[in-house]
Amino acid sequence: MSNSSVPLLSAHSITKSFGPRTARHQVLFDVSADVHAGECLAVIGGSGSGKSTLTRIMLGLESADSGSVEYESQSIVGGRKSPGFAALRHESGLVFQDPFSSLDPRWRVAKSVAEPLRLQRRDLNNTDIDERVTAALTMAGLEPADFLNRYPIDLSGGQAQRVVIARAIINEPKVILADEPMSAIDVAARIQILATFAAIRAARPSTAIIMVSHDLGVVQHIADRILVLHDGRVEETGPTAEVLGNPQSDYTRQLIEAASL
């Protein structure tokens, strides 16, 4: 993990509400969070705690009602007009809960994984792209010769998620958002996905990962630091061993007890 004191990506005093003006539902209350280069930050909490909303705001996928978000010390607030937004979009990878909703059923694996390169790296020729697709699939734990020509319908849930991960890392992003990447697959596949993220961290030690998860068993094996959200507020945050070993809030203790850690 990087020793830099300056976060790669940071959010400050984020508030967010949904719904019509006459019936607004606030889901985030003055929430701040950051992640450093090379760090894995786990954002945990129960359903409806605001985990996904916070991380989507941090990656520029949603806008906040108030507060600020900075990528490499440049604001991304305001979308395309902001100085940091374009850089973040080009230097981030996304992995969501349902891999099949992220893959075009008409495309073979090779085309799906290559898509970010074809959109963002027009300087690369087909040979360069093929080599990078092969490398990304290999890092994701998939044998390229066995998977390049498959369609999503030919994949198990775990295999499809690893294809999505390969696509997320194809551009060597500086930050990856993994939003519940293991919740829709079986236990054996979860172990493989966990190993895939460990391999990414080993091969690319400066890459930051923000992982949204309700599975503390997964979190304790991969995260350097934990942020606990409850009803849209930060309950506590700190190094993983400290939060899980000596929780400071009743809510965190309840999560740990429920997970039987």
State the predicted function of each range.
Residues 20-22, 76-93, 107, 111, ...:
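ABC ATPase NBD coupling module
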Residues 59:
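Helix-to-loop junction immediately C-terminal to a conserved catalytic motif
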Residues 67-78:
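Conserved ABC transporter NBD signature motif
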Residues 151-155, 159:
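Conserved ABC ATPase signature
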Residues 172:
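Conserved catalytic motifs of ABC-family nucleotide-binding domains
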Residues 219-221:
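A short, surface-exposed alpha-helical micro-motif characterized by mixed small hydrophobic
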